[in-house]
Amino acid sequence: MRHNHGYRKLGRTSSHRAALLKNLTIAIVKAGKIETTLPKAKELRGYVEKLITRARKGDFNAHKFVFAHLQDKEATNMLVTEIAPKYATRNGGYTRIIKTRVRKGDAAEMAYIELVAQ
């Protein structure tokens, strides 16, 4: 039974799921908007929003925290110095999920996940 289960498995091992979320986060930070399956987008939303909330402080510890999760210098600098300051007065809700289509090959629901413009 799935009662009170805290996250989506996404059909992957825990390390594969962590790598997937990390790579999707790097992609959304660099591009601002990506298309993925709806369950991945819903799982990614919480991951990205926690990073943005920590990055809003902008200090050394924020850089360390974000880099520990992303392992990408370029994405870390973009998130802490460019993206997070835009949301300084916003309490959460940094991302938006828009359902787009049903993928032809496997009938998976697709969605855009994007950073909300300020």
Swiss-Prot record:
Quaternary structure (record): Part of the 50S ribosomal subunit. Contacts protein L32.
PROSITE patterns in alphabetical order: RIBOSOMAL_L17
Family, as annotated: Belongs to the bacterial ribosomal protein bL17 family.
Organism: Campylobacter fetus subsp. fetus (strain 82-40)
Keywords: Ribonucleoprotein, Ribosomal protein
Family matches, as InterPro entries: Ribosomal_bL17 (IPR000456), Ribosomal_bL17_CS (IPR047859), Ribosomal_bL17_sf (IPR036373)
NCBIfam families recorded: L17
GO process terms (BP): translation
Name of the featured protein: Large ribosomal subunit protein bL17
